[in-house]
Amino acid sequence: MSQTSQTRFIPHSPSPPVEWRIEPGLTPYEKALAFMEQRADAIRAGTAGEMVWLVEHPPLYTAGTSASPGDLLDPNRLPVYQTGRGGEYTYHGPGQRVAYVMLDLKRRREDVRAFVTALEDWIIASLARFNIRGERRQGRVGVWVARPEKSPLPDGTIMEDKIAAIGIRLRRWVSFHGIAVNVEPELAHFSGIVPCGISGFGVTSLVDLGLPVTMADFDVALKEAFEEVFGAAEPLFETDSLKRSA
């Protein structure tokens, strides 16, 4: 998908490719948070490069800085973690690709809103490789898919399901946290929360839409689309980042 100069986040000057890593297995959330904090600190200090870190988590809920307690509908269902990212409640679990995005926006563009738009563009371009039309909606951060086969909304408009969530944090213009795209998660767990504080809409995944996409398939698309929006990344391979220094 072609990107305009307004939505791309290519570095201003020649830079090393973004480090791109896939974590094997299920990553405990506490360890992921600690690693992100450490890596973001190192990027700010100039002792480490930018990084995109792909993980899956065991089933859990996270609460962003805007989370309302009333949106946690089933507090005893899964572990709940408070986190410093923006947004409200979301679910993470096996079959969902979480991409933690640790980029130095001083080297790109110091514009939070444009950065969120670029993350949405990245997801939309990734989904397009599987002929899925993902769309953004004003006032509903994330990526949405029209579901005309479902009952319409109360106002008669077409039902839409969320397929990807975005929740980021910036500290001195270095980003951490990131995006979560539903490849084949257990969608029933979303019923324990009001996802992202938005009621009245559904949640879907690539497999729920009838596409037998594997996580490996999606990772390839994710990397290709990332390079369209953010520039070059290292060759994709799997490693254990938690055993590496930041």
From Swiss-Prot:
The record marks 162 as: Lowers pKa of active site Cys. Its EC number is 2.3.1.181. Keywords: Acyltransferase, Cytoplasm, Transferase. It comes from the Bacteria. InterPro entries: aa-tRNA-synth_II/BPL/LPL, BPL_LPL_catalytic, Octanoyltransferase, Octanoyltransferase_CS. The active site is at residue 196. Signal peptide: none annotated. GO terms for cellular component: cytoplasm. Pfam families: LplA-B_cat. One of its GO terms (molecular function) is lipoyl(octanoyl) transferase activity. Its main location: cytoplasm. It is an enzyme of class 2 (transferase). Substrate binds at residues 85-92, 165-167, 178-180. Residues 46-234 form the BPL/LPL catalytic domain. Pathway: Protein modification; protein lipoylation via endogenous pathway; protein N(6)-(lipoyl)lysine from octanoyl-[acyl-carrier-protein]: step 1/2. One of its GO terms (biological process) is protein modification process. In the reaction, the free carboxyl group of octanoic acid is attached via an amide linkage to the epsilon-amino group of a specific lysine residue of lipoyl domains of lipoate-dependent enzymes. Catalyzes the transfer of endogenously produced octanoic acid from octanoyl-acyl-carrier-protein onto the lipoyl domains of lipoate-dependent enzymes. Lipoyl-ACP can also act as a substrate although octanoyl-ACP is likely to be the physiological substrate. Belongs to the LipB family. This is Octanoyltransferase. It comes from Chelativorans sp. (strain BNC1). The lineage of its organism: Bacteria, Pseudomonadati, Pseudomonadota, Alphaproteobacteria, Hyphomicrobiales. The gene is lipB.
